């Protein structure tokens, strides 16, 4: 059950239960899948050694009133020799029922959630120049995510894409949507050095519609006997 220390959004991620979930991959203690949150924590009951941490620009998208921040991130010292403290991706730390059995980072994938449908319709309405309808969808979603229901927002012809892009990051962070979003919007991205990051790997720029947005065809499929599959641009 939801406790005083958890809001409904946090409970959805810590217990895989919510009226907002349209379809999820069900799991039980005796029948479950992989550990979705492993790479974000690598917790060994002594320390956290994450493979990835969220970028500063993502953290800065959330306001103090946004209930999603506490559900999505938790600041912890890492177990690496440098001992740095950093916000970690918390939404996949694991289902509490599994954690009670010392089974970490196991969550039920939530393939369809109601909030995604609101975001899809908001974008569709904005593309149809129905900015009032798009604003209503975004505001309805945000009121469910902000303390006191204070999430009203308005979009226009000039700002709708920027606002919807930011809201999709806040709501769907690390759920597998970002690549397809950038492809759909014909946008590139740039990785910039972060606080305490290493120089190597801290800078990368991919332009819009770069061929690398499409994964290369696996080599074994190209070279298999009798294969008539042709390489795509990413193979070249």
What are these regions (language model features)?
Residues 1-38, 49, 62-236:
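Acidic/polar-rich alpha-helix caps and helix-coil junctions
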Residues 39-44:
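Aromatic (Trp/Tyr/Phe) and Gly/Pro-enriched flexible surface segments
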Residues 54-55, 218:
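Residue-level signal for threonine
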């Amino acid at each position: 059950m939801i406790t005083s220390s958890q809001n409904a959004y946090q409970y959805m991620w810590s217990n895989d239960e919510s009226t907002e979930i349209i379809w999820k991959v069900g799991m039980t203690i005796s029948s479950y899948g992989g550990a979705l949150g492993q790479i974000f924590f690598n917790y060994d009951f002594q320390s956290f050694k994450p493979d990835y941490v969220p970028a500063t620009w993502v953290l800065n998208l959330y306001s103090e009133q946004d209930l999603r921040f506490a559900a999505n991130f938790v600041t912890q010292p890492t177990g690496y020799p440098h001992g740095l403290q950093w916000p970690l991706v918390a939404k996949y730390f694991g289902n509490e029922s599994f954690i009670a059995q010392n089974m970490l980072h196991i969550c039920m994938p939530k393939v369809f959630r109601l909030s995604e449908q609101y975001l899809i319709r908001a974008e569709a309405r904005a593309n149809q120049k129905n900015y009032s309808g798009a604003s209503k969808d975004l505001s309805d979603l945000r009121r469910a995510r902000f303390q006191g229901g204070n999430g009203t927002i308005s979009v226009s012809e000039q700002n709708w894409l920027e606002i919807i892009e930011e809201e999709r990051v806040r709501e769907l962070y690390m759920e597998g949507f970002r690549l397809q979003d950038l492809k759909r919007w014909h946008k590139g991205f740039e990785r910039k050095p972060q606080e305490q990051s290493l120089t190597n790997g801290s800078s990368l720029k991919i332009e819009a519609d770069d061929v690398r947005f499409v994964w290369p065809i696996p080599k074994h499929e190209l070279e298999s006997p009798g294969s008539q599959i042709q390489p795509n641009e990413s193979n070249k």
